[in-house]
Amino acid sequence: MPYCTSLRQHNPKIYDLFESIPVSSHEHELFARYIKNNTEIEGHLFTPKAEIEGFEDIDGLIRKYNSRLYYKHIGRRIEEYKNYLYIKSYVEDSTEIIKKLQELASSGVSQYTASVDSWISRESYTIDDDGKKEALRQMFADSHVALIYGSAGTGKSTLIKHISNFWADKDKIFLANTHPAVDNMRRKVTAGNSEYNTIAKFLSKRNNNTDCDVLFIDECSTVSNDDMRRVLEKANFKLLVLVGDVYQIESIYFGNWFSIAQKFVPETSIFELTHPYRTTNDNLLTVWDRVRKLDDAILEPLVKNSYVARLDESIFEHGEDDEIILCLNYDGLYGINNINRFLQNSNPNESVVWGINTYKVGDPILFNESNIFSPLIHNNSKGKIVSIRPEKQQIRFDIELEESINGIDAWGYDFELIGESETGKSIISFSVNKYRSTDEDDEDNDSTVIPFQVAYAVSIHKAQGLEYDSVKIVITNETEERITHNIFYTAITRAKNKLKIYWSPETEQSVLGRLEVKNSTKDAHLLSRLSSITMTS
Protein backbone atom coordinates (compact mmCIF):
# COMPACT_ATOMS: atom_id res chain seq x y z
CA MET A 1 0.00 0.00 0.00
CA PRO A 2 2.46 2.65 -1.24
CA TYR A 3 0.23 5.66 -0.56
CA CYS A 4 0.11 5.05 3.21
CA THR A 5 3.18 2.93 4.04
CA SER A 6 6.85 3.06 3.10
CA LEU A 7 10.15 1.41 3.81
CA ARG A 8 12.06 2.46 6.92
CA GLN A 9 14.01 5.69 6.30
CA HIS A 10 12.42 5.98 2.86
CA ASN A 11 9.41 8.29 2.75
CA PRO A 12 8.76 9.53 -0.80
CA LYS A 13 6.91 12.79 -1.40
CA ILE A 14 3.23 12.42 -2.23
CA TYR A 15 3.66 14.11 -5.62
CA ASP A 16 6.38 11.59 -6.54
CA LEU A 17 3.91 8.81 -5.78
CA PHE A 18 1.24 10.48 -7.91
CA GLU A 19 3.66 10.62 -10.83
CA SER A 20 4.77 7.00 -10.40
CA ILE A 21 1.67 5.02 -9.38
CA PRO A 22 -1.88 5.41 -10.74
CA VAL A 23 -4.28 6.56 -8.01
CA SER A 24 -7.10 4.32 -9.19
CA SER A 25 -7.75 1.42 -6.79
CA HIS A 26 -5.66 3.14 -4.08
CA GLU A 27 -8.39 5.31 -2.52
CA HIS A 28 -8.37 3.24 0.70
CA GLU A 29 -4.67 4.06 1.09
CA LEU A 30 -5.25 7.78 0.57
CA PHE A 31 -7.99 7.62 3.19
CA ALA A 32 -5.64 5.90 5.66
CA ARG A 33 -3.02 8.55 4.88
CA TYR A 34 -5.58 11.26 5.66
CA ILE A 35 -6.38 9.73 9.07
CA LYS A 36 -2.68 9.22 9.82
CA ASN A 37 -1.81 12.82 8.88
CA ASN A 38 -4.71 14.19 10.91
CA THR A 39 -3.23 12.38 13.90
CA GLU A 40 0.51 12.82 13.39
CA ILE A 41 0.55 16.31 11.86
CA GLU A 42 -2.60 17.96 13.20
CA GLY A 43 -2.35 16.20 16.58
CA HIS A 44 -5.91 14.81 16.71
CA LEU A 45 -6.08 11.35 18.26
CA PHE A 46 -9.72 11.04 17.17
CA THR A 47 -11.04 12.22 13.78
CA PRO A 48 -14.78 13.08 13.57
CA LYS A 49 -16.28 10.91 10.86
CA ALA A 50 -18.82 13.59 9.97
CA GLU A 51 -16.10 16.14 9.14
CA ILE A 52 -14.28 13.97 6.60
CA GLU A 53 -14.68 15.32 3.08
CA GLY A 54 -13.60 14.05 -0.33
CA PHE A 55 -14.15 10.35 0.34
CA GLU A 56 -17.16 8.17 -0.42
CA ASP A 57 -18.17 4.92 1.32
CA ILE A 58 -15.89 5.53 4.31
CA ASP A 59 -16.87 2.23 5.97
CA GLY A 60 -15.92 0.36 2.81
CA LEU A 61 -12.56 2.12 2.62
CA ILE A 62 -11.83 1.23 6.26
CA ARG A 63 -12.71 -2.44 5.68
CA LYS A 64 -10.54 -2.61 2.56
CA TYR A 65 -7.57 -0.93 4.26
CA ASN A 66 -7.77 -3.05 7.42
CA SER A 67 -8.09 -6.28 5.42
CA ARG A 68 -4.87 -5.56 3.54
CA LEU A 69 -2.68 -4.89 6.57
CA TYR A 70 0.18 -7.29 7.25
CA TYR A 71 -0.67 -9.45 10.26
CA LYS A 72 2.23 -7.98 12.28
CA HIS A 73 0.90 -4.45 11.65
CA ILE A 74 -2.43 -4.89 13.42
CA GLY A 75 -1.75 -1.70 15.40
CA ARG A 76 -2.24 0.32 12.21
CA ARG A 77 -5.92 -0.64 12.01
CA ILE A 78 -8.43 2.20 11.72
CA GLU A 79 -11.23 1.71 14.23
CA GLU A 80 -14.36 3.63 15.18
CA TYR A 81 -15.80 4.82 18.48
CA LYS A 82 -18.94 6.97 18.74
CA ASN A 83 -18.56 8.22 15.15
CA TYR A 84 -14.88 9.07 15.66
CA LEU A 85 -12.09 7.26 13.82
CA TYR A 86 -8.72 6.45 15.38
CA ILE A 87 -5.60 4.39 14.79
CA LYS A 88 -5.54 1.40 17.12
CA SER A 89 -1.91 1.56 18.29
CA TYR A 90 -2.03 5.30 19.02
CA VAL A 91 -4.96 4.88 21.39
CA GLU A 92 -3.38 1.80 22.99
CA ASP A 93 -0.10 3.66 23.59
CA SER A 94 -1.93 6.66 25.10
CA THR A 95 -3.96 4.37 27.35
CA GLU A 96 -0.99 2.41 28.68
CA ILE A 97 1.00 5.58 29.40
CA ILE A 98 -1.88 7.22 31.28
CA LYS A 99 -2.59 4.07 33.31
CA LYS A 100 1.07 3.86 34.36
CA LEU A 101 1.14 7.53 35.38
CA GLN A 102 -2.08 7.11 37.37
CA GLU A 103 -0.58 4.11 39.14
CA LEU A 104 2.52 6.12 40.06
CA ALA A 105 0.39 9.06 41.22
CA SER A 106 -1.74 6.94 43.55
CA SER A 107 0.64 7.19 46.53
CA GLY A 108 3.55 9.27 47.79
CA VAL A 109 6.86 8.77 49.56
CA SER A 110 6.51 8.48 53.32
CA GLN A 111 8.00 11.43 55.27
CA TYR A 112 9.14 13.02 52.01
CA THR A 113 8.50 16.72 52.79
CA ALA A 114 10.10 16.48 56.23
CA SER A 115 13.20 14.88 54.71
CA VAL A 116 13.52 17.71 52.15
CA ASP A 117 13.19 20.35 54.88
CA SER A 118 15.82 18.58 56.95
CA TRP A 119 18.20 18.34 53.97
CA ILE A 120 17.82 22.02 53.05
CA SER A 121 18.52 23.03 56.64
CA ARG A 122 21.39 20.59 57.18
CA GLU A 123 23.18 21.41 53.91
CA SER A 124 22.30 25.14 54.00
CA TYR A 125 21.11 24.49 50.47
CA THR A 126 19.98 27.52 48.47
CA ILE A 127 17.10 27.39 45.97
CA ASP A 128 16.75 30.39 43.68
CA ASP A 129 13.01 31.00 44.16
CA ASP A 130 10.17 30.03 46.46
CA GLY A 131 8.21 28.36 43.65
CA LYS A 132 10.95 25.82 42.97
CA LYS A 133 11.53 25.30 46.68
CA GLU A 134 7.86 24.54 47.32
CA ALA A 135 7.74 22.26 44.27
CA LEU A 136 10.71 20.29 45.60
CA ARG A 137 9.12 20.06 49.06
CA GLN A 138 5.80 18.71 47.76
CA MET A 139 6.92 16.79 44.67
CA PHE A 140 6.74 13.25 46.01
CA ALA A 141 4.68 13.81 49.14
CA ASP A 142 1.56 12.32 47.53
CA SER A 143 2.86 10.83 44.29
CA HIS A 144 5.70 8.81 42.75
CA VAL A 145 5.55 10.86 39.54
CA ALA A 146 6.08 14.60 39.03
CA LEU A 147 4.96 16.38 35.87
CA ILE A 148 6.78 19.71 35.56
CA TYR A 149 5.42 22.19 33.00
CA GLY A 150 7.08 25.50 32.24
CA SER A 151 7.50 27.95 29.40
CA ALA A 152 10.88 28.82 27.89
CA GLY A 153 13.42 30.21 30.35
CA THR A 154 11.45 29.50 33.54
CA GLY A 155 14.18 27.32 35.05
CA LYS A 156 13.05 23.78 34.31
CA SER A 157 16.67 22.60 34.03
CA THR A 158 17.49 24.33 37.31
CA LEU A 159 14.68 22.46 39.06
CA ILE A 160 16.02 19.20 37.61
CA LYS A 161 19.35 20.11 39.23
CA HIS A 162 17.72 20.72 42.63
CA ILE A 163 15.85 17.40 42.50
CA SER A 164 19.07 15.62 41.52
CA ASN A 165 21.01 17.18 44.37
CA PHE A 166 18.41 16.03 46.87
CA TRP A 167 18.64 12.47 45.52
CA ALA A 168 22.45 12.74 45.10
CA ASP A 169 23.18 9.34 46.67
CA LYS A 170 20.51 7.54 44.63
CA ASP A 171 20.91 6.08 41.14
CA LYS A 172 19.54 8.41 38.48
CA ILE A 173 18.97 8.11 34.74
CA PHE A 174 18.44 11.22 32.60
CA LEU A 175 16.78 10.86 29.20
CA ALA A 176 15.80 13.22 26.38
CA ASN A 177 15.10 12.91 22.68
CA THR A 178 17.94 15.09 21.45
CA HIS A 179 21.66 15.22 22.15
CA PRO A 180 21.55 18.95 23.05
CA ALA A 181 18.90 18.29 25.71
CA VAL A 182 20.90 15.39 27.14
CA ASP A 183 24.09 17.46 27.15
CA ASN A 184 22.25 20.34 28.80
CA MET A 185 21.21 18.08 31.69
CA ARG A 186 24.73 16.69 31.91
CA ARG A 187 26.09 20.23 32.30
CA LYS A 188 23.42 21.36 34.77
CA VAL A 189 23.46 18.30 37.01
CA THR A 190 26.54 17.86 39.17
CA ALA A 191 25.19 15.13 41.46
CA GLY A 192 26.86 11.74 41.30
CA ASN A 193 25.31 8.36 40.45
CA SER A 194 23.94 9.78 37.21
CA GLU A 195 23.64 8.27 33.73
CA TYR A 196 22.67 10.27 30.63
CA ASN A 197 21.23 8.94 27.38
CA THR A 198 19.11 9.82 24.42
CA ILE A 199 15.83 7.91 24.39
CA ALA A 200 16.89 6.10 21.21
CA LYS A 201 20.07 4.83 22.87
CA PHE A 202 18.21 3.88 26.05
CA LEU A 203 15.70 1.84 24.04
CA SER A 204 18.36 0.13 21.92
CA LYS A 205 18.77 -3.61 22.37
CA ARG A 206 22.39 -3.13 23.45
CA ASN A 207 21.44 -1.02 26.47
CA ASN A 208 20.93 -3.04 29.65
CA ASN A 209 21.40 -0.19 32.11
CA THR A 210 17.71 0.35 32.88
CA ASP A 211 17.51 0.24 36.70
CA CYS A 212 17.49 3.43 38.77
CA ASP A 213 15.87 5.09 41.75
CA VAL A 214 14.86 8.26 39.86
CA LEU A 215 14.16 8.47 36.13
CA PHE A 216 14.20 11.96 34.55
CA ILE A 217 12.80 12.67 31.07
CA ASP A 218 13.30 16.17 29.67
CA GLU A 219 11.61 17.90 26.71
CA CYS A 220 8.66 15.55 27.06
CA SER A 221 6.64 17.30 24.35
CA THR A 222 9.15 15.94 21.81
CA VAL A 223 8.76 12.32 22.98
CA SER A 224 6.38 10.22 20.91
CA ASN A 225 3.70 8.04 22.51
CA ASP A 226 5.38 4.93 21.13
CA ASP A 227 8.77 5.84 22.63
CA MET A 228 7.26 6.85 25.97
CA ARG A 229 5.36 3.60 26.31
CA ARG A 230 8.52 1.60 25.54
CA VAL A 231 10.56 3.63 28.04
CA LEU A 232 8.01 2.93 30.78
CA GLU A 233 8.03 -0.76 29.90
CA LYS A 234 11.83 -1.05 29.78
CA ALA A 235 12.89 1.15 32.70
CA ASN A 236 12.82 -0.06 36.29
CA PHE A 237 12.51 2.95 38.59
CA LYS A 238 10.97 4.12 41.87
CA LEU A 239 10.33 7.79 41.03
CA LEU A 240 9.59 9.48 37.71
CA VAL A 241 10.22 13.15 36.81
CA LEU A 242 8.69 14.40 33.54
CA VAL A 243 9.68 17.87 32.34
CA GLY A 244 8.60 19.90 29.34
CA ASP A 245 6.58 22.64 27.70
CA VAL A 246 3.54 21.72 25.61
CA TYR A 247 3.92 25.01 23.70
CA GLN A 248 7.35 24.19 22.28
CA ILE A 249 8.07 22.14 19.16
CA GLU A 250 6.33 18.80 19.43
CA SER A 251 7.38 15.25 18.62
CA ILE A 252 8.27 14.39 15.03
CA TYR A 253 6.06 11.34 15.45
CA PHE A 254 2.69 11.39 17.18
CA GLY A 255 3.07 12.38 20.81
CA ASN A 256 0.10 13.78 22.75
CA TRP A 257 0.68 12.01 26.05
CA PHE A 258 2.37 14.94 27.84
CA SER A 259 -0.39 17.40 26.95
CA ILE A 260 -3.24 15.10 28.04
CA ALA A 261 -1.49 13.60 31.09
CA GLN A 262 -2.35 16.59 33.29
CA LYS A 263 -6.04 15.81 32.75
CA PHE A 264 -5.64 12.32 34.20
CA VAL A 265 -3.35 12.72 37.22
CA PRO A 266 -4.13 14.61 40.45
CA GLU A 267 -2.96 18.19 41.00
CA THR A 268 -0.49 16.91 43.60
CA SER A 269 1.53 15.40 40.73
CA ILE A 270 1.58 18.58 38.60
CA PHE A 271 3.96 21.52 39.01
CA GLU A 272 4.07 24.60 36.79
CA LEU A 273 6.93 27.10 36.60
CA THR A 274 5.80 30.55 35.49
CA HIS A 275 8.54 33.08 36.31
CA PRO A 276 10.83 33.67 33.28
CA TYR A 277 14.59 34.02 33.79
CA ARG A 278 15.81 34.16 30.17
CA THR A 279 15.03 37.86 29.88
CA THR A 280 14.10 40.84 32.02
CA ASN A 281 12.85 42.76 28.98
CA ASP A 282 9.21 43.53 29.77
CA ASN A 283 8.34 44.13 26.11
CA LEU A 284 9.65 40.71 25.12
CA LEU A 285 7.83 39.10 28.04
CA THR A 286 4.58 40.71 26.89
CA VAL A 287 5.02 39.29 23.38
CA TRP A 288 5.87 35.82 24.71
CA ASP A 289 2.83 35.83 26.98
CA ARG A 290 0.41 37.00 24.29
CA VAL A 291 1.68 34.48 21.75
CA ARG A 292 1.58 31.68 24.30
CA LYS A 293 -2.02 32.50 25.21
CA LEU A 294 -2.98 33.47 21.62
CA ASP A 295 -4.19 36.84 22.83
CA ASP A 296 -6.17 38.80 20.22
CA ALA A 297 -3.71 41.69 20.61
CA ILE A 298 -0.54 39.80 19.63
CA LEU A 299 0.33 42.28 16.89
CA GLU A 300 0.16 45.39 19.10
CA PRO A 301 3.41 44.85 21.11
CA LEU A 302 5.15 43.49 18.00
CA VAL A 303 4.50 46.72 16.09
CA LYS A 304 4.90 49.06 19.08
CA ASN A 305 8.38 47.74 19.86
CA SER A 306 9.48 47.46 16.22
CA TYR A 307 9.75 43.69 16.46
CA VAL A 308 8.42 43.30 12.89
CA ALA A 309 9.94 44.44 9.62
CA ARG A 310 9.41 44.06 5.91
CA LEU A 311 11.33 41.16 4.42
CA ASP A 312 14.15 42.82 2.49
CA GLU A 313 17.93 42.91 2.23
CA SER A 314 18.31 44.37 5.75
CA ILE A 315 18.12 40.77 6.97
CA PHE A 316 21.68 40.39 5.64
CA GLU A 317 23.07 43.00 8.04
CA HIS A 318 24.86 41.30 10.94
CA GLY A 319 24.68 43.83 13.77
CA GLU A 320 25.34 41.98 17.04
CA ASP A 321 28.02 39.62 18.34
CA ASP A 322 25.49 37.26 19.91
CA GLU A 323 22.97 37.14 17.08
CA ILE A 324 21.22 34.40 15.13
CA ILE A 325 18.89 34.30 12.14
CA LEU A 326 16.20 31.61 12.32
CA CYS A 327 14.59 30.13 9.22
CA LEU A 328 12.48 27.12 8.29
CA ASN A 329 13.89 26.46 4.83
CA TYR A 330 17.46 25.79 3.70
CA ASP A 331 17.10 26.83 0.06
CA GLY A 332 16.03 30.04 -1.67
CA LEU A 333 17.10 33.67 -1.31
CA TYR A 334 16.08 33.80 2.36
CA GLY A 335 17.05 30.22 3.18
CA ILE A 336 19.67 29.18 5.72
CA ASN A 337 22.30 28.28 3.12
CA ASN A 338 22.14 31.60 1.26
CA ILE A 339 22.00 33.73 4.43
CA ASN A 340 25.04 31.93 5.86
CA ARG A 341 26.89 32.39 2.57
CA PHE A 342 25.97 36.09 2.24
CA LEU A 343 26.84 37.02 5.83
CA GLN A 344 30.10 35.11 5.65
CA ASN A 345 30.94 37.01 2.44
CA SER A 346 30.28 40.23 4.39
CA ASN A 347 32.89 39.14 6.94
CA PRO A 348 36.02 41.09 5.83
CA ASN A 349 38.50 38.45 7.03
CA GLU A 350 40.36 36.14 4.66
CA SER A 351 38.55 33.03 3.39
CA VAL A 352 40.00 29.60 4.09
CA VAL A 353 38.59 26.80 1.93
CA TRP A 354 38.82 23.29 3.37
CA GLY A 355 37.11 20.55 1.41
CA ILE A 356 33.74 21.88 0.27
CA ASN A 357 33.44 24.40 3.12
CA THR A 358 34.71 27.93 3.66
CA TYR A 359 35.74 29.40 7.02
CA LYS A 360 36.72 32.87 8.21
CA VAL A 361 38.01 34.30 11.47
CA GLY A 362 35.01 35.86 13.19
CA ASP A 363 32.49 33.32 11.92
CA PRO A 364 29.97 32.28 14.61
CA ILE A 365 29.75 28.50 14.93
CA LEU A 366 27.71 25.77 16.57
CA PHE A 367 29.33 22.50 17.60
CA ASN A 368 27.47 19.63 15.95
CA GLU A 369 26.68 15.97 16.57
CA SER A 370 30.07 14.86 15.26
CA ASN A 371 31.56 16.85 18.15
CA ILE A 372 34.30 14.73 19.73
CA PHE A 373 34.56 17.11 22.71
CA SER A 374 31.26 16.08 24.28
CA PRO A 375 30.15 16.15 27.04
CA LEU A 376 32.37 19.10 28.08
CA ILE A 377 31.51 21.00 24.91
CA HIS A 378 28.05 19.80 24.07
CA ASN A 379 26.21 19.54 20.78
CA ASN A 380 24.80 22.97 19.84
CA SER A 381 27.34 24.84 21.99
CA LYS A 382 28.03 28.29 20.59
CA GLY A 383 31.47 29.59 19.68
CA LYS A 384 33.46 31.87 17.37
CA ILE A 385 36.46 31.22 15.14
CA VAL A 386 39.43 33.34 16.30
CA SER A 387 42.22 31.73 14.25
CA ILE A 388 42.58 29.37 11.27
CA ARG A 389 45.90 27.81 10.25
CA PRO A 390 45.64 25.52 7.20
CA GLU A 391 48.52 23.18 6.44
CA LYS A 392 49.10 20.48 3.83
CA GLN A 393 47.75 17.56 5.83
CA GLN A 394 45.60 19.27 8.45
CA ILE A 395 43.88 22.47 9.50
CA ARG A 396 44.02 24.02 12.97
CA PHE A 397 41.22 26.08 14.48
CA ASP A 398 41.24 28.30 17.56
CA ILE A 399 37.69 28.65 18.86
CA GLU A 400 36.37 31.05 21.48
CA LEU A 401 33.79 29.16 23.53
CA GLU A 402 30.60 30.63 24.91
CA GLU A 403 31.80 30.07 28.48
CA SER A 404 34.93 29.57 30.54
CA ILE A 405 36.46 26.19 31.37
CA ASN A 406 39.63 25.29 33.28
CA GLY A 407 42.53 22.91 32.79
CA ILE A 408 40.98 20.18 34.93
CA ASP A 409 37.77 20.37 32.88
CA ALA A 410 39.80 20.07 29.67
CA TRP A 411 41.95 17.16 30.80
CA GLY A 412 41.63 14.11 28.56
CA TYR A 413 40.06 15.92 25.60
CA ASP A 414 41.75 16.18 22.22
CA PHE A 415 42.18 19.95 22.27
CA GLU A 416 44.45 22.51 23.91
CA LEU A 417 43.15 25.16 26.29
CA ILE A 418 45.27 28.06 25.06
CA GLY A 419 43.90 31.13 26.83
CA GLU A 420 40.95 33.39 27.25
CA SER A 421 39.34 36.19 25.30
CA GLU A 422 38.96 39.81 26.40
CA THR A 423 35.52 38.90 27.74
CA GLY A 424 36.92 36.08 29.87
CA LYS A 425 35.73 33.21 27.68
CA SER A 426 37.99 30.22 27.06
CA ILE A 427 39.80 29.69 23.76
CA ILE A 428 40.60 26.15 22.66
CA SER A 429 42.75 24.91 19.79
CA PHE A 430 42.45 21.66 17.83
CA SER A 431 43.36 20.24 14.45
CA VAL A 432 41.40 18.31 11.83
CA ASN A 433 43.16 15.98 9.41
CA LYS A 434 42.73 16.14 5.65
CA TYR A 435 42.74 12.35 5.26
CA ARG A 436 41.72 9.52 7.53
CA SER A 437 44.41 7.32 8.98
CA THR A 438 44.30 3.65 8.00
CA ASP A 439 44.23 2.92 11.75
CA GLU A 440 40.90 4.70 12.21
CA ASP A 441 38.07 2.19 12.52
CA ASP A 442 35.70 4.20 14.69
CA GLU A 443 33.23 6.19 12.58
CA ASP A 444 32.31 8.25 15.66
CA ASN A 445 35.86 9.58 16.02
CA ASP A 446 36.73 10.41 12.42
CA SER A 447 39.72 12.77 12.61
CA THR A 448 38.75 14.39 9.28
CA VAL A 449 35.35 15.63 10.45
CA ILE A 450 35.16 19.29 11.48
CA PRO A 451 33.09 19.24 14.70
CA PHE A 452 31.20 22.46 14.08
CA GLN A 453 29.19 24.35 11.47
CA VAL A 454 29.19 28.02 10.51
CA ALA A 455 26.02 29.45 12.07
CA TYR A 456 24.99 32.95 11.09
CA ALA A 457 21.62 31.28 10.45
CA VAL A 458 20.12 27.97 11.64
CA SER A 459 16.76 26.25 11.52
CA ILE A 460 14.14 27.01 14.17
CA HIS A 461 14.12 23.33 15.12
CA LYS A 462 17.89 23.29 15.71
CA ALA A 463 17.63 26.47 17.79
CA GLN A 464 15.39 24.81 20.38
CA GLY A 465 17.32 24.96 23.65
CA LEU A 466 19.53 27.86 22.49
CA GLU A 467 19.31 31.52 23.46
CA TYR A 468 20.80 34.63 21.86
CA ASP A 469 20.95 38.30 22.75
CA SER A 470 19.52 39.15 19.33
CA VAL A 471 17.22 36.95 17.24
CA LYS A 472 16.01 37.57 13.70
CA ILE A 473 13.25 35.34 12.33
CA VAL A 474 12.64 34.99 8.60
CA ILE A 475 9.19 33.86 7.45
CA THR A 476 8.56 33.82 3.70
CA ASN A 477 5.37 33.10 1.81
CA GLU A 478 6.86 29.69 0.90
CA THR A 479 7.17 28.69 4.57
CA GLU A 480 4.22 30.50 6.20
CA GLU A 481 1.95 27.43 6.11
CA ARG A 482 4.53 25.46 8.12
CA ILE A 483 4.61 28.01 10.95
CA THR A 484 2.58 26.42 13.73
CA HIS A 485 1.91 28.00 17.10
CA ASN A 486 4.60 25.79 18.68
CA ILE A 487 7.22 26.68 16.05
CA PHE A 488 6.47 30.42 16.24
CA TYR A 489 6.57 30.40 20.05
CA THR A 490 9.84 28.45 20.09
CA ALA A 491 11.42 30.93 17.67
CA ILE A 492 10.50 34.14 19.51
CA THR A 493 11.56 32.74 22.91
CA ARG A 494 15.18 32.27 21.76
CA ALA A 495 15.70 36.05 22.23
CA LYS A 496 17.10 37.52 25.45
CA ASN A 497 17.00 41.18 24.42
CA LYS A 498 16.36 41.99 20.75
CA LEU A 499 13.79 40.43 18.42
CA LYS A 500 12.98 41.12 14.79
CA ILE A 501 10.51 39.16 12.65
CA TYR A 502 10.95 39.62 8.91
CA TRP A 503 7.87 38.95 6.79
CA SER A 504 5.59 40.61 4.27
CA PRO A 505 2.27 42.15 5.40
CA GLU A 506 0.46 39.29 3.66
CA THR A 507 2.56 36.65 5.41
CA GLU A 508 2.12 38.43 8.75
CA GLN A 509 -1.66 38.34 8.37
CA SER A 510 -1.63 34.72 7.22
CA VAL A 511 0.61 33.44 10.03
CA LEU A 512 -1.11 35.29 12.89
CA GLY A 513 -4.53 34.41 11.50
CA ARG A 514 -3.77 30.70 11.41
CA LEU A 515 -2.07 30.31 14.78
CA GLU A 516 -3.96 27.98 17.06
CA VAL A 517 -3.19 26.08 20.23
CA LYS A 518 -3.82 22.38 19.86
CA ASN A 519 -6.68 21.54 22.22
CA SER A 520 -6.47 18.00 23.55
CA THR A 521 -9.57 18.19 25.77
CA LYS A 522 -11.86 16.39 23.31
CA ASP A 523 -9.28 13.65 22.74
CA ALA A 524 -8.86 13.23 26.50
CA HIS A 525 -12.62 12.84 27.06
CA LEU A 526 -12.97 10.29 24.24
CA LEU A 527 -9.92 8.37 25.44
CA SER A 528 -11.33 8.34 28.97
CA ARG A 529 -14.60 6.77 27.82
CA LEU A 530 -13.11 4.38 25.29
CA SER A 531 -10.40 3.04 27.60
CA SER A 532 -12.31 3.40 30.90
CA ILE A 533 -9.70 5.61 32.56
CA THR A 534 -10.77 8.35 34.97
CA MET A 535 -10.08 12.02 34.30
CA THR A 536 -9.20 14.39 37.14
CA SER A 537 -9.86 17.69 35.34
Where are these regions (language model features)?
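Flexible, charged surface loops at secondary-structure boundaries
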Residues: 139-141, 167-169, 208-211, 235, ...
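Conserved adenine-nucleotide phosphate-binding loops and their immediately adjacent elements
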Residues: 110-124
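N-terminal accessory nucleic-acid engagement/regulatory domains that precede
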Residues: 1-111
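Pre-Walker A adenine-sensing motif
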Residues: 124-142
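ASCE P-loop NTPase helicase motor core
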Residues: 138, 146-304
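Conserved, well-folded catalytic cores of nucleic-acid-processing
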Residues: 100-107, 166, 188-191, 234, ...
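Core RecA-like ATPase module of SF1/SF2 helicases and allied nucleic-acid translocases
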Residues: 154, 193-196, 279-282, 320-537
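Conserved RecA-like ASCE P-loop NTPase motor core of nucleic-acid helicases/translocases
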Residues: 148-187, 243, 299-341, 351-358, ...
